Regions:
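Short coil/turn motifs at secondary-structure junctions
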Residues: 86-90, 116, 126-128
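A solvent-exposed, acidic/Ser-Thr-rich amphipathic alpha-helical stretch
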Residues: 6-8, 26-79, 83-86
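Polar/charged side chains located within well-ordered beta-strands of beta-rich proteins
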Residues: 10, 14, 81, 109-111, ...
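Short, low-complexity N-terminal intrinsically disordered segments enriched in polar/charged residues
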Residues: 1-35, 139-145
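Low-complexity, intrinsically disordered terminal/linker segments enriched in charged
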Residues: 120-145
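Exposed beta-sheet edge and beta->alpha loop/turn motif
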Residues: 88-114
């Protein structure tokens, strides 16, 4: 597939992810995620069904999430995107009870595309920044008394 076609697939994934966060309909992602998807993210299970469960849980924790695509670069069968998401922490997330905090987090993804679907996805979110904004990890210069 041409680079522009692959970029369109990733753009569609981002649109569908927004739908998942709003509605919980993870099966909508089957349009762009291959059944044999391999997902790479620190601490995350690598298979499609586990990834879908994670996205559903994420949507419950951050139901007002909005995604802003900052950059997208394609070459060969890979598409890289850098995005920023903003959301309010309204439900449990990774064992952290809702804080009501408004978050801004950046992520970079590398996606490998074959036959019109994402077959492999590497995610590198700013987990330290996320945990600091949730109050799970102190920000630099902050200390517990």
């Amino acid at each position: 597939m041409a680079a522009e076609e692959n970029k369109a697939i990733l753009q569609r994934f981002n649109e569908l992810a927004g739908e998942v966060f709003r509605t919980g309909n993870v099966d909508a992602l089957d349009e762009v995620l291959a059944p044999e998807l391999v997902y790479h993210q620190p601490g995350a299970p690598p298979d499609l069904e586990s990834y879908k469960r994670f996205l559903a849980m994420f949507g419950l924790a951050f139901p007002d999430v909005s995604l802003t695509l900052e950059d997208m670069i394609a070459e060969g069968d890979k598409v890289v995107d850098r995005l920023t998401w903003q959301a309010t922490h309204q439900g449990p997330f990774m064992g952290i009870p809702p804080t009501g905090n408004r978050l801004t987090v950046t992520e970079i993804h590398i996606n490998r595309i074959a036959e019109g679907r994402i077959v492999e996805r590497w995610a590198q979110p700013d987990l330290l920044g996320l945990m600091q904004q949730l109050g799970a990890v102190p920000a630099p210069g902050q200390h517990d008394s």
